[in-house]
From Swiss-Prot:
Subunit structure: Homodimer. Heterotetramer of two MnmE and two MnmG subunits.
Keyword tRNA processing: yes
Sequence similarity: Belongs to the MnmG family.
The gene coding this protein: mnmG
Pfam families: GIDA (PF01134), GIDA_C_1st (PF21680), SAM_GIDA_C (PF13932)
Protein name according to UniProt: tRNA uridine 5-carboxymethylaminomethyl modification enzyme MnmG
Predominant location category: cytoplasm
Any GO CC annotation of this UniProt entry: cytosol
Length: 629
């Protein structure tokens, strides 16, 4: 095919899903001339699976993206149809916001946001190959022969990467939602020497709302006072739609059991590794055979569509079996299936082939982000896309990459897990993966990351000023409560008795009273007058910081200990073969991962404390040898 020079850019982003849009917006907003290429312009930021954003750990990631200057939180706040805060009865470390999105509004709003950016060119095109010169990525070549040149390239092709859809015995080449897949780029990555693996994910059928008998289901409304994902959002949308809860039953399970021989999950048809934390209904029936029923949530896909997402019923069983099992579920006896559920297999680049900046080790100037790195979920993809976009732009401007620590953000935990440990299955972010989850809360994402966002140019001066004012207000109110003494008046004693708290014998500092589990900031505010107005956001922060002060201090001490290990850098040109005493597995893993610090090396599976001790001694001896010379 004849090729032609189609233009030169600073950064090219291949793909415009949830990773691609964050990568492109970050790069463009940082001043890099950015080209975003996508197979279909109508699929920008499309939600091929569940129409929701957030949830445990994932909701915190959305807040972190926003605190750094990304778009997902803002876009969700503009387009949600339901907002709920989860785990409100638990501690602040596991609270999480989850939105039901209008998937069509979400997509259109995000596309228009990109179109308005001066530094971004959004174009339809299918990338087949990369332009590589002397191990450096210099651009991309499309199937129409267009050659686009750039200083860095970010690949965010997601499940389009050599995608194959499977429904029962039917199997065909396709991206999600029957879109054109990206086949030749995967083949090209293999030619370049990248290790790819087949992963699998799935989606449930969509059904017609007007054929559902909602009287047989349980209503799941949104919060009366919804919270925002973005720290920029001032007004919340109040016109919310409910979701609905129903259950499978033994009849449903019998139909599934009778057709397991036709499910790709249990035949040789399925080659890809599926997501452990998002199992298909077939998998659930087999793995949890003692359970008489499983939850099914009916989630509207938008305000202007009849389509309802059947959450909890992900399946790749044949079409007629899907229809039959749907109609055994209470409320769905006469339901019409509008779209069939399916499994999709796709290529993933094994993420231990990446640096923590998300640049590939094999090809300089080439970054990958999103599901192509072996993750599952829109939020995980968006977090990676943001960091890849930031670092691709910073490489153009000859600046050091931004690498978030495990103590700074869930995004840091996610990327460190991927590049240090790799993954054998689609990776899902969980609160249990974070050692310092009390520090990585939903409520304090801005306090952790706004400084970085402003420094790299994604947070405006105006927003940064508001952030500094909030910080000052929190400190001022904490100081006030630490100085204000509450006397054991009749009014105070009555209030304490009413809520089951012990009465005061002497006076007590307001901050010390707030440390009691049953005492909230609102209760303190009732008995301690305030000269200035304190917003709910500031009140929440003051309460958490005072109430959990001891635990937070303990976590910070652990972080300091870990940072001392992070500060012990491993020389770039280290020869692991020259280190005697390392276990064979440790030697292989260290050579493959090429950790940047002793802390990262210690997190590699197969590298034991004894190996770390040997490595430390070797590095120290190397320093001594250099000094003596």
């Amino acid at each position: 095919m004849q090729t032609y020079d189609a233009g030169t850019f600073d950064v090219i982003v291949v793909g415009a899903g949830h990773a691609g849009v964050e990568a492109g917006l970050a790069s463009g907003r940082m001043g890099a001339k950015t080209l975003m290429l996508t197979i279909n312009l109508d699929m920008v930021a499309f939600m091929p699976c569940n129409p929701s954003v957030g949830g445990p750990a994932k909701g915190v990631v959305v807040r972190e993206i926003d605190a750094l200057g990304g778009e997902m939180g803002r876009n969700t706040d503009k387009t949600y149809i339901q907002m709920r805060m989860l785990n409100t009865g638990k501690g602040p470390a596991v609270r999480a916001l989850r939105a039901q999105a209008d998937k069509w509004d979400y997509q259109h709003e995000m596309k228009h946001t990109i179109e308005k950016e001066e530094n971004i060119t959004l174009r339809q095109g299918l990338v087949d190959r990369l332009v590589i010169e002397d191990g450096v990525c210099k651009g991309v070549i499309t199937n129409s022969g267009a050659i686009y040149y750039a200083k860095t390239v970010v690949i965010t092709t997601g499940t389009f990467s050599r995608g194959e859809i499977i429904v029962g015995e039917l199997r065909y080449s396709s991206g999600p939602n029957n879109q054109q897949p990206s086949v030749k780029l995967s083949e090209h990555l293999e030619e370049l020497g990248f290790e790819l693996r087949r992963f699998k994910t799935g989606t449930p059928p969509r059904v017609k709302s007007s054929t559902i008998d909602y009287s047989k289901t349980e209503e799941q409304p949104g919060d009366d006072h919804p919270r925002a994902f973005s720290f920029d959002t001032v007004e919340m949308l109040l016109d919310q739609l409910p979701c609905w809860l129903t259950y499978t039953n033994e009849t449903t399970h019998e139909i599934i059991q009778a057709n397991l021989h036709r499910s790709p999950m249990f035949t040789a048809t399925k080659k890809g590794t599926g997501a452990r934390y998002c199992p298909s209904i077939e998998d659930k029936i087999v793995r949890f055979s003692d359970k008489p029923r499983h939850q099914i949530f009916l989630e509207p896909e938008g305000k202007n569509t009849e389509e309802v997402y059947v959450q909890g019923l992900s399946t790749s069983l044949p079409e007629e079996v899907q229809r039959e099992m749907l109609r055994t579920i209470p409320g769905l006896e006469n339901v019409e299936m509008m779209r069939v559920g399916y499994a999709i297999e796709y290529d993933a680049v094994m993420p231990d082939q990446l640096w923590p900046s998300l640049e590939t080790k094999l090809v300089e100037g080439l970054f990958t982000a999103g599901q192509i790195n072996g993750t599952s979920g829109y939020e995980e993809a968006a977090g990676q896309g943001l960091m890849a976009g930031i670092n691709a732009a910073r490489k153009v401007f000859e600046k050091e990459p931004v690498i978030l620590g495990r103590d700074q953000a869930y995004i840091g935990v996610l990327i460190d897990d991927l590049v240090t440990k790799g993954t054998e299955e689609p990776y899902r972010l969980l609160t249990s993966r974070a050692e310092y989850r009390l520090l990585l809360r939903h409520d304090n994402a801005d306090l952790r990351l706004t400084e970085i966002g402003h420094e790299i140019g994604l947070i405006s001066d105006e927003r940064y000023e508001r952030f500094l004012a909030k910080q000052s207000a929190i400190e001022a109110e904490k100081e006030r409560l630490q100085k204000t003494r509450i006397k054991p008046t009749a009014e105070v004693q009555a209030m304490l008795k009413e809520i089951g708290s012990g009465e005061l014998k002497d006076g007590i500092l307001a901050a010390d009273l707030l440390r009691r589990p049953e005492i909230t900031y609102d209760k303190i505010a009732q008995i301690v007058s305030r000269e200035t107005f304190v917003t709910d956001e500031i009140a929440e922060q003051v309460e958490i910081q005072i109430k959990y002060e001891g635990y937070i201090q303990k976590s910070n001490l652990q972080v300091e200990k870990m940072k001392r290990m992070e500060d012990k850098k491993i020389p770039e040109n280290i020869d692991y073969d020259a280190i005697s005493g390392l276990a064979t597995e440790a030697l292989e893993k260290l050579k493959k991962i090429e950790p940047l610090s002793i802390a990262q090396a210690s997190r590699i599976s197969g590298v034991n404390p004894a190996d770390i001790s040997i490595l430390l001694v070797y590095i120290e001896q190397g320093k001594i040898a250099k000094i003596s010379k």
